């Protein structure tokens, strides 16, 4: 079973050579991006790592995303990547895991790790096998070309969340901890953008509250801020999973908005790259 790309040519270039060049531009961007390319990754991850990574079009969020992938490359190469993305389409199960086969991008095919899928399904009360939730969803797909560019070969577990409640976040964190017993060199990505379509000043204020909750590694505070301050962050459930995993350190690598790229500060979207270890 092959999951074909649905936002190639929209969120990122559909031609391999153009996509590689776009990713290089994101890394080499000195204004918002890190200003450097990742070098060869010669060692494997020794312990699990969490990553908060944006999922907008590469021209907007790609330079911010590059910070996270550059930092993971410095730590080591994952053999398994669990990617938790929000369900923007309303299709499929509340917690849908793509069970088998490959995900395709212009850079090639990425295998789904069926052993890891089985562990998550058996350890979670809410996760179900589901392809429908993934068919038109972009939040997981846009992470793959960056991963392919930096690491080459790896396997994935794609997890799509329509239900992003605290209960589900706690349940999935338990399931991921069970997974970590078998896969130590695993990268867990929470794919999310931050506040949406308000002016720059308002978005910065709201985004910094999200950053505060992440820095404190406090998922309850995150949910509190989302409700109290009306923050339209789309992938908060995946971030809550990371915050519930018991990582001992958090580093905020980069925050920016679409307004920093386009110059339009009336309606912006916030982007964050952060690493947990």
Curated annotation (Swiss-Prot):
Q: Which InterPro entries match?
A: MEMO1_fam (IPR002737)
Lineage: superkingdom: Bacteria
**Coiled-coil intervals:** none
Q: Which family does it belong to?
A: Belongs to the MEMO1 family.
Matching PANTHER family:
PROTEIN MEMO1
Which HAMAP family does the UniProt entry name for this protein? Answer: MEMO1 (MF_00055)
Protein's UniProt name: MEMO1 family protein CTN_0605
> Which organism's genome codes for this protein?
Thermotoga neapolitana (strain ATCC 49049 / DSM 4359 / NBRC 107923 / NS-E)
């Amino acid at each position: 079973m092959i999951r074909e790309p649905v936002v190639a040519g929209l969120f990122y270039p559909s031609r391999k050579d153009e996509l590689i060049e776009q990713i290089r531009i994101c890394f080499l961007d000195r204004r918002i991006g890190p200003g450097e390319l990742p070098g060869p990754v010669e060692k494997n991850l020794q312990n699990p790592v969490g990553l908060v990574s944006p999922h907008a079009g590469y021209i907007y969020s790609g330079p911010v995303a590059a910070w996270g992938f550059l930092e993971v490359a410095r730590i080591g190469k994952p053999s398994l990547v669990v990617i938790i993305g929000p369900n923007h389409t309303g299709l499929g199960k509340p917690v849908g895991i793509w069970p088998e086969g490959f995900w395709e991008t212009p850079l090639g095919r990425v295998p789904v790790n069926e052993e890891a899928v089985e562990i998550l399904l058996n350890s979670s009360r809410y996760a179900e096998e589901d392809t429908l939730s993934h068919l038109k969803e972009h939040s997981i797909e846009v992470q793959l070309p960056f991963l392919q560019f930096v690491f080459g070969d790896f396997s994935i577990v794609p997890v799509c969340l329509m239900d992003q409640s605290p209960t589900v976040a706690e349940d999935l964190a338990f399931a991921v901890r069970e997974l970590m017993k078998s896969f130590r060199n695993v990268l867990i990505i929470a794919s999310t953008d931050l506040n949406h379509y308000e002016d720059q000043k308002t978005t910065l204020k709201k985004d910094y509250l999200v950053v505060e909750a992440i820095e404190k590694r406090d998922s309850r505070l995150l949910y509190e801020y989302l409700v109290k301050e009306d923050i339209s962050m789309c992938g908060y459930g995946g971030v809550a999973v990371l915050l519930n995993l018991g990582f001992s350190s958090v580093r905020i690598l980069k925050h920016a908005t679409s307004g920093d790229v386009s110059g339009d500060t009336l309606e912006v979207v916030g982007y964050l790259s952060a690493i947990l270890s």
